[in-house]
Amino acid sequence: MVGPAPRRRLRPLAALALVLALAPGLPTARAGQTPRPAERGPPVRLFTEEELARYGGEEEDQPIYLAVKGVVFDVTSGKEFYGRGAPYNALTGKDSTRGVAKMSLDPADLTHDTTGLTAKELEALDEVFTKVYKAKYPIVGYTARRILNEDGSPNLDFKPEDQPHFDIKDEF
């Protein structure tokens, strides 16, 4: 007796390689070009860890968000990759910077912490951040940690003028 064919899933690294291969064909803004106000989406917002966790792809009628480098992206259009039961669902609902840098879905790596990453991992992080997430998915906000220290004081390393889609007069 022959049963149903087993479901095949792309291995995480193979799928990431596929995404990177397709990335050059994705539409992107020209260097130095700021989107006109009419081209911008809704204003971005700050997300606490608890708020971001609500957007982990478990609810069918809710957007799916993930953060990389403190930037929160709406990855709902990639539901087949990030939705419930999908290969990269573990990255959603949190800042998964370390996991993206290491190309790892290990729960210990699904954190914002970049301490101890190698130069090669940091380079991979920047490439995926720019060529995949910034090029393909809308920015909906930032993690509060990116702008505020744990004690609530301002993060002096945060420079609004260096942030994609961050127009401080429109946001606060």
UniProtKB/Swiss-Prot annotation:
Residues 44-129 form the Cytochrome b5 heme-binding domain. GO terms for cellular component: endomembrane system; endoplasmic reticulum; extracellular space; membrane; mitochondrion. Non-classical progesterone receptors involved in extranuclear signaling are classified in 2 groups: the class II progestin and adipoQ receptor (PAQR) family (also called mPRs) (PAQR5, PAQR6, PAQR7, PAQR8 and PAQR9) and the b5-like heme/steroid-binding protein family (also called MAPRs) (PGRMC1, PGRMC2, NENF and CYB5D2). It comes from the Eukaryota. Interacts with PINK1 and PARK7. It comes from Homo sapiens. Acts as a neurotrophic factor in postnatal mature neurons enhancing neuronal survival. Promotes cell proliferation and neurogenesis in undifferentiated neural progenitor cells at the embryonic stage and inhibits differentiation of astrocytes. Its neurotrophic activity is exerted via MAPK1/ERK2, MAPK3/ERK1 and AKT1/AKT pathways. Neurotrophic activity is enhanced by binding to heme. Also acts as an anorexigenic neurotrophic factor that contributes to energy balance. The keyword Heme applies. It is found in: Secreted, Extracellular space; Mitochondrion; Endoplasmic reticulum. This is Neudesin.
